[in-house]
Design a protein with these regions (language model features):
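Extracellular/periplasmic periplasmic-binding protein-like sensory domains
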Residues: 293-372, 385-386, 442, 446-455
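Solvent-exposed, acidic/polar segments of extracytosolic/periplasmic ligand-binding ectodomains
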Residues: 45, 60-68, 79, 325, ...
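Segments of small-molecule ligand-sensing domains
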Residues: 355-368, 379-442
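Extracytoplasmic "Venus flytrap"
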Residues: 65-103, 109, 122-130, 152-153, ...
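Beta-alpha junction/loop-to-helix N-cap segments that form part of ligand/metal-binding clefts
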Residues: 24, 66-68, 93-101, 108-187, ...
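Bacterial lipoprotein signal-peptidase II cleavage site
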Residues: 23-33
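Extracytoplasmic ligand/sensor domains, especially the bilobed periplasmic-binding protein
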Residues: 145-256, 306-332
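Hydrophobic alpha-helical segments within soluble ligand-binding/sensing domains
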Residues: 132, 192, 198-225, 264-266, ...
Length: 457
């Protein structure tokens, strides 16, 4: 089967024949130009690489083709992608359903030009910079890897992406939300943006704006405190809330961090109490979130404060705590209903039924649909750029793969997906739910009290 690359190769060979005919065996001088390391190295469909007089034999993993190289998958071999999620420790509730959703999407999507797709052994980002970087180095060392689904946590992505990007790979995250990884939504790249990074999760600038509008306009509260744990996700989201709340006219009385691993939250809560806030927004994880709700009643001045968590706490273990009754939570829309991924034909309802049949329980966190859509986005892009050889092998150009992901446009379980220039591809709708009864531990069953779908103010 001939594809775009086959046609370009024929064109290059034709030009080469003409050059040889014109020059004979003369020793004309040729020059090459080194790429500017800071320049955009994405190959466009109409460009070709400079020809040299050295030919490298092709192997199963030969790097060739565009500026970022390519992967050749031998006939009968599997296409290798990787899952990089938090699958152990306190945040495994987030990464495990993401990885399962990736595996299910691969099964539903099927073969690509006769080749199966595999994630190999799932890698663990540990929800930490150290875990993200170590796993990224493992991925980058394997020249057979085509792309990555992950990470679970923004902090892991910040450390992983320089390695992933330098290796010419693409990574699509289902649950990273830190604005630093993409952009400020006004055309300026985030401080940790790297080429080749994409996500189907929302940008937390939207979530911060949503919570600020809910607290100020719907609840009618004008003072609030914000608590983070110092990582890019929690600090970024708490900061986005602070900025948006103050722009609306509210006052953030305290902006403070806890340390991961802390069990005594009394000192931090006592500091918060000095500002007499009407609400506290704490977009952190367990177990620190557990200790806050369990200890806050004992802090004078905070007995009646309104508590608001975020998607990191929208998990059954946390929702089952009696102290969470009366809380609000912000996070991505979970009202997927019969939304169907057009690339596989699987609806959100069908997926959940299949997930429970496979795992014996519902997904434990909010980003399962984002993981499914992210995986199909990657698989579809691979299918669009893969070139099939006469021997049944596939060649996948990494620069073209990034281009294909960037150009993605399809209906997924989370809604319509399309990527901006910095890799924000997913639905930006944020919902706030109310948790009145700790016997209800399925986040999808919590009543939606506020919906937000765009920046305001």
């Amino acid at each position: 089967m001939k594809t775009r690359r086959s046609m370009r190769l024929l064109a290059v060979l034709s030009v080469l024949v003409l050059i040889i005919a014109a020059c004979g065996d003369g020793g004309g001088e040729s020059t090459t130009t080194e790429a500017d390391p800071g320049a955009d190295t994405t190959a466009s469909p109409g460009t070709t690489e400079p020809m040299t007089d050295t030919t490298e034999p092709m192997t199963d993993t030969t790097t060739a083709g565009g500026d970022l190289g390519s992967v050749t998958v031998a006939s009968g071999e599997q296409i290798q992608i990787r899952s990089l999620e938090a699958i152990s420790g306190d945040v495994a509730f987030l990464g495990t359903p993401n990885q399962v959703a990736t595996e299910m999407a691969i099964e539903d999507f099927g073969q690509i030009l006769g080749h199966d797709v595999t994630i190999g052994t799932g890698l663990d980002d540990l929800c930490s910079a150290e875990g993200g970087q170590a796993a990224a180095q493992t991925i980058a060392a394997d020249e057979q890897v085509v792309g990555v689904i992950g990470t679970s946590c923004s902090g892991a992505a910040v450390a992983a992406m320089p390695v992933i990007s330098d290796a010419g790979l693409a990574m699509i995250s289902p649950s990273n939300t830190s604005p630093a990884l993409t952009s400020d939504l006004e055309g300026t790249a985030g401080t940790d943006y790297q080429p080749g990074y994409y996500r189907t999760a929302h940008n937390d600038l939207f979530q911060g704006q949503a919570v600020a509008n809910f607290v100020f306009n719907d609840l009618g509260l004008t003072t609030a405190a914000a608590i983070h744990d110092g990582d890019p996700y929690t600090q970024g989201l708490a900061g986005a809330f602070q900025n948006a709340f103050e722009e609306l006219g509210g006052t953030v009385t305290t902006f403070v961090g806890v340390n991961k691993g802390d069990t005594d939250m009394t000192p931090v809560l006592s500091e918060v109490a000095t500002g007499a806030p009407e609400a506290i927004y704490f977009p952190i994880f367990q177990p620190e979130g557990d200790f806050i709700v369990q200890q806050i009643a004992g802090v004078s001045g905070l007995e009646d404060v309104t508590l608001i968590g975020a998607d990191g706490l929208l998990v059954s273990d946390f929702l089952s705590l009696p102290e969470t009754e009366g809380m609000y939570f912000s996070g991505p829309s979970l009202q997927f209903g019969e939304n169907t991924n057009e690339l596989t034909g699987v609806s959100a309802t069908d997926f959940l039924a299949n997930y429970e049949a496979r795992e014996g329980e519902a997904p434990s966190a909010a980003f399962w649909a984002h993981a499914y859509d992210a995986t199909t986005m990657l698989l579809n892009a691979i299918s669009e750029v893969a070139v099939e050889g006469d021997d049944g092998s596939l060649t996948i150009d990494r620069a073209e793969l990034r281009d294909a992901i960037t150009a993605s446009s399809f209906a997924g379980m989370i809604g319509n997906l399309a990527c901006d220039e910095f890799g924000d591809c997913g639905s930006q709708e944020i919902q706030i739910v109310e948790h009145a009864d700790s016997s209800v531990t399925d986040a999808t069953q919590l009543p939606v009290v506020f919906t937000y779908s765009g920046l305001e103010g």
